[in-house]
């Protein structure tokens, strides 16, 4: 089972396409949708929804996959549920990058402060990161510097921020899920 968490652009048709691509790894791909506008409510909703969905699966190794803002949540929700996660162009600091896009971006900083201390250290090797060198939204080099002590990083030379084509990485994602 793969949980797919969309980015800030929840209605993008690219989300459906990425889910179809992930079905080459596991036919059971589930979209876990969230508002993107209310971080505290989103966290509660995502925790409840993932716990509920896990009750209906016998997969011994479910995987969280998120893009952009979805990767922010995949890392945290995956950690809190003991799941591996794949972070594609993760938005590590939405309290900064979401300024002007949502009403209360500071809620992300509050969530980070209340999260388990040093959670990445405790989550080492339980996530893999795929970064675009040509990300048109985030500073992928800064993201790599923040995450490389904890997670393996794969670099892509072509894909933009929303990362529409996962095909090249499907074998690595599958190996990570099963490994």
UniProtKB/Swiss-Prot annotation:
PANTHER family: ESTERASE YQIA-RELATED, UPF0227 PROTEIN YCFP
Species in which this protein is naturally found: Shewanella sp. (strain MR-7)
Any single Pfam family the record assigns to this protein: UPF0227
Family, as annotated: Belongs to the UPF0227 family.
Matching InterPro entries: AB_hydrolase_fold, UPF0227, UPF0227/Esterase_YqiA
Protein name: UPF0227 protein Shewmr7_1806
